[in-house]
Amino acid sequence: MRHSAAPIRAAAAALLLAGCAESPPPVTAERVLAVGGIQPVVNAVALSPDGSVVAVGDMDGELVTRELPSGTERWRGRVAAGRVDGLVFSPDGSLLASTAQDGRTFELWQVLVGRQAAVLEIRDSRTAAFHPTEPTLVVGSLGALHVVDAQRGEITRTLPNAHGGENVYAAAFSSDGQALVTASDQGNIKVWAWPTLTLRASVSMSKSLEQMAPVSLVIGRQGTRAAANGLLGRVHIVDLAKQQEERIFDNTPEAPGHGMHAEMRRSLAFSQDGDWLFAPAMHDRGVRILNLANGKAYPVFTGDAPFYKAMSISVPSSLVALLRPGDEQGRGPYALEVWRLTYSTR
């Protein structure tokens, strides 16, 4: 069942993003869409860069895209892999990549018409990252990195054993496309020069169960700072230039069904200037913004869900899409929510 949600005004901060480092930015959020009554176990959500489409994937392998802000269903499709674990749009919004960590294939879909553009034999794909300007993407599969020509739907290069026997769990390009950053299942981050894929830097995050499953990874505009959140939800900030961990922001589960954060892929996003980071709120009840200079966290909004199980943040379109369970145990029926961010001005 689809319905338009009554706007929910969120908690706001006090000063401009460019203002005093001791003060939070004036970000407010309003819920602009809610789609409830979803029966399959939804597992992944993604926003197109321009904010015109939201895609949802579930554990049964079904893809559903909706137009924004209306929420009108555009198309449904079913992936060959049998499940959807991650979704990512191409920079121009024309393609949608679907990963399946226990599947035998990786897929590209044409967003406009809902047709498969390519089905590639890439097993256990954990992550995919589109190049910002080239028709190319990188797929992490077990320990390898596969370079894929998005136009032809072909693998053009494979870098085996990219992390020295560790599996690749996350990947992201810098905004200028000159660097690729990857994270392994053991919490090791590597920075690769593009397109040569020569190693530029390597950093290890603090060793614990937390780092053994990084689920979201982003790199700042200057390419000198990266952020990752892991299985327990903590956010790790890494100084790539100094090749060391900079700071950690905590997160904890709250509801009984909220023990792990394995579905929080693509739940981090740097601000345009790279000085702030959007991230899941404490207990995954909404969104907060982190001041990377002083280590403080400020609320952006808190929803009424017991917790959110997946999230996608699009800074260019000022939108956040979230998936929520029906109860504190993480069971259905599930729902999709979309919130719009607003920045105040002086």
Spans of features found by a protein language model:
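Bacterial N-terminal signal peptides
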Residues: 9-19
